Swiss-Prot record:
Alphabetical list of NCBIfam families matching this protein: argB
GO biological process, one term: arginine biosynthetic process via ornithine
HAMAP family: ArgB
Pathway where it operates: Amino-acid biosynthesis; L-arginine biosynthesis; N(2)-acetyl-L-ornithine from L-glutamate: step 2/4
Keyword NAD: no
Location(s), subcellular: Cytoplasm
Gene name tied to this protein: argB
Name the UniProt record assigns to this protein: Acetylglutamate kinase
């Protein structure tokens, strides 16, 4: 039986390439040191074990470089899978899941009790110190009920559609996050909010991340998605957009479907004080590192010129 040959040592060229990469990253490390970056973790990357480990490594790397990461995660597909297992049908309006009392309890169970703990474990296994939270902890995310209206084609009357316990953040109380950051702990937040009446609300993870980014005065909001970023009408990636250009992309139909609410989240965050927001492909290994620490970045950056 032949023994496996040892892996070849890196060549001089490979070492030089790594040195150039580190040299390129240095000014970006200085730029972000001591600043907060909010990362929304979602999409198919959450279902890929290898990408999940790489994501956790990137979060720990950010922390080791002096950045204060805050993670907000989604979990729509996992909620859908649990509802299917329980034989509960899902209904959507404008991409939002109609959420009755039973469904919001299941959503909280999946988001806070399962997904959140898995992400915390991944970060801790990678050498970080993470703690799981939901928006209900210390009234972190106060939410109000979301409503939608649709015009009836027969009567031409606008009808209000009750989405149940779906909420939008109206206030973020970041005191708990500041305490965790001062203790060098990485917060991992499930997008569950609490209403003025104590009711639990399911919140879109992008929306929650944007509100948190504004509340903690983050330097960056990173939305990990399943697309490369904002595409022009020829399906080419737009690497950078001003606030005005991003709004035009919505108005003129360049942005369509699920990209519209993501751009709107970025606009609210930037208008709320975040320096820039980036929509990037979470399926790309180390997308966060590419965005933060390389000249070319990754995805589409939306900010004020």
């Amino acid at each position: 039986m032949s023994t496996p040959s040892p892996a070849a040592a890196p060549s001089r060229e490979e070492w030089l390439a790594k040195a150039r990469t580190l040299s390129e990253a240095l000014p970006f490390m200085r730029r972000y040191a001591g600043r907060t970056v909010v990362v929304k973790y979602g999409g198919h990357a959450m279902g890929d074990e290898s990408l999940g480990r790489r994501f956790a490594n990137d979060i720990v790397l950010m922390k080791q470089m002096g950045i204060s990461p805050v993670v907000v995660h989604g979990g729509g597909p996992q909620i859908g899978q649990m509802l299917e297992r329980l034989k509960i049908k899902s209904e959507f309006v404008d991409g939002l899941r109609v959420t009755d009392k039973e469904t919001v309890e299941i959503a909280e169970m999946v988001l806070s009790g399962s997904i959140n703990k898995q992400i915390v474990a991944l970060i801790n296994d990678a050498g970080g110190d993470a703690v799981g939270l939901s928006g209900k902890d210390d009234d972190l995310i106060e939410a109000r009920k979301v409503t939608r209206s649709k015009r009836d084609p027969d009567s031409n009357i606008e009808k209000v559609i009750d989405l149940g316990f779906v909420g939008d953040p109206f206030r973020v109380n970041p005191g708990l996050l500041h305490k965790l950051q001062q203790a060098d702990i990485i917060p991992v937040i499930a997008p569950i909010g609490i209403g003025e009446d104590g009711q639990t609300y399911n919140i879109n993870a992008d929306t929650a991340a944007g509100a948190i980014a504004a509340a903690v005065n983050a330097t960056r909001l990173l939305l990990l998605t399943d697309v490369a970023g904002v595409l022009d009408k020829q399906k080419r990636l737009i690497p950078e957009m001003s606030v005005e250009a991003a709004q035009r992309a919505i108005d003129d139909g360049t942005a369509t479907g699920g990209m519209i609410p993501k751009i709107e989240t970025c606009l609210r965050a930037v208008n709320g004080g975040v320096e820039a927001a980036v929509i990037l492909d979470g399926r790309v290994p180390h997308a966060i590192v590419l965005e933060l620490f390389t000249e070319g970045g990754a995805g589409t950056l939306i900010g004020r010129k």
